């Protein structure tokens, strides 16, 4: 009886370990930070009346990456550049607005995101020609507009919440992390070819 109980216990523990590993969308991997991290910001004694929403993108693809994100409640940040193996963080800080009933000040649901853009295989900012910025009509680009989420999507997409790692540091600060892979590049190629085909048809 004791042997049976011990065996069942071991099987249960092994099952839990296997489940927790497979359920983690972002297994541990080191990335080089190219700008301030969430931990850096929060170590600077942030204003306790503000809400801090961090979005971090890790470039696990074979291509250089520019990325942009904004939310439905803010204009969003700038365009960030990551070489393979690098990661960058943007902070979207918001204040409570009592006159807005539906105001998402702490983003704990991805439906608060407005859209995300990925641009692949471009030179670093200093190496781009003057006045040249990445755009969806010239470059390999994937764009995602968050009119609806796509949970458990058969293809990898940032609109699938299971592809993100969510961390809540406090009632005033959270971080969302997305790992960009070659699957995102393939989707960018597909979208780009589709846009170019539509442009040719229009001409």
Predicted features and spans:
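N-terminal hydrophobic targeting signals that begin at the initiator methionine
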Residues: 1-2, 20
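Sec-dependent signal peptide recognition
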Residues: 2-9
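C-terminal motif of bacterial Sec signal peptides marking the signal peptidase cleavage site
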Residues: 15-18
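Intrinsically disordered, low-complexity segments enriched in small/polar residues
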Residues: 20-58, 62-203
């Amino acid at each position: 009886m004791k042997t049976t109980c011990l065996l069942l216990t071991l099987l249960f523990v092994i099952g839990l370990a296997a489940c927790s590993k497979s359920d983690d969308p972002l297994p541990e991997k080191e990335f080089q930070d190219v700008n301030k991290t969430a931990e850096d910001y929060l170590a600077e004694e942030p204003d306790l009346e503000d809400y801090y929403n961090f979005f971090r993108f890790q470039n696990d693809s074979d291509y250089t990456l520019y990325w942009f994100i904004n939310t439905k409640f803010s204009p969003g940040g700038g365009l960030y550049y990551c070489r393979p193996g690098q990661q960058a963080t943007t902070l979207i800080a918001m204040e409570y607005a009592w006159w807005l009933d539906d105001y998402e000040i702490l983003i704990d649901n991805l439906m608060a995101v407005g859209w995300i853009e990925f641009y692949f295989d471009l030179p670093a900012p200093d190496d781009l020609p003057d006045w040249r910025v990445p755009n969806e009509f010239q470059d390999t680009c994937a764009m995602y507009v968050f009119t609806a989420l796509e949970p458990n999507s058969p293809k990898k997409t940032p609109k699938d919440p299971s592809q993100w790692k969510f961390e809540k540091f406090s009632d005033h600060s959270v971080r969302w992390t997305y790992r960009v892979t070659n699957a995102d590049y393939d989707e960018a190629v597909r979208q780009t070819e589709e846009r170019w085909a539509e442009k040719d048809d229009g001409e």
